[in-house]
Curated annotation (Swiss-Prot):
NCBIfam families: S6. This is Small ribosomal subunit protein bS6. GO terms for cellular component: cytoplasm; ribonucleoprotein complex; ribosome. Binds together with bS18 to 16S ribosomal RNA.
């Protein structure tokens, strides 16, 4: 027994059409297939995605996947209808062999896609937060290093001021000592002069007595 045959049509709608019009296109092409005596296996919107290349100035598009079975002639009818629509910017139908695909729950897929997007957003927010924390930590480190450098400089300046003060005090002490020594020398000299005067006076008195 040969594998069953089915067709898979992927078409892309303009990214700027409202959601209700997207639903209208899904319904429209389902009706086209039904009139052509084809059977619809699955009809689901894949969501807005970035295009591999620009199509008619569009960088994004709304992807819709339509799986169906029939005698093959219905494909021409479907693609003719899509070709006449300004909202369809690209379409492609591929003949598939193998087990028929099961109908998927569009709402469930939308929820899954939403969850994935939320997880990605959360991850991006977390990464941005981590980057900010790393930057803040780096800034804090730089501020601390700058503060430490300032403190080291202030400590050095304080030491230099203290050393300068000590040098000044030593110099003042030295000057005081020199002044004292000069004073002592003067006093010794004055005492010596007084003694010499006294001795001269005594000599004069002795001489006068003789």
């Amino acid at each position: 027994m040969s594998d069953p045959t089915y067709y898979e049509t992927m078409y892309i709608l303009r990214p700027d059409i409202p959601e209700d019009e997207v639903e209208g296109h899904l319904k429209k092409y389902s009706e086209v297939l039904e009139k052509a005596k084809a059977k619809i296996i699955d009809n689901q919107m894949r969501g807005k995605r970035r295009l591999a290349y620009t199509i008619g100035k569009h960088k994004e598009g709304i992807y819709v996947q339509l799986s169906h079975t029939g005698n093959g002639k219905h494909v021409e009818t479907l693609e003719r209808s899509m070709r006449l629509s300004e909202d369809v910017i690209r379409y492609l139908t591929v003949k598939q062999y193998g087990p028929l695909p099961t109908k998927r729950n569009t709402k469930s897929q939308d929820k899954e896609a939403s969850t994935t997007n939320n997880e990605n957003d959360t991850k991006e927010v977390k990464e941005a937060k981590d980057t900010k924390e790393v930057k803040e930590a780096k800034d804090t480190k730089e501020v601390k290093e700058a503060k430490d450098t300032k403190e080291v400089k202030e400590a050095k300046d304080t030491k230099e001021v203290k050393e300068a003060k000590d040098t000044k005090e030593v110099k003042e002490a030295k000057d005081t000592k020199e002044v004292k020594e000069a004073k002592d020398t003067k006093e010794v000299k004055e005492a010596k002069d007084t003694k010499e005067v006294k001795e001269a006076k005594d000599t004069k008195e002795v001489k006068e007595e003789g």
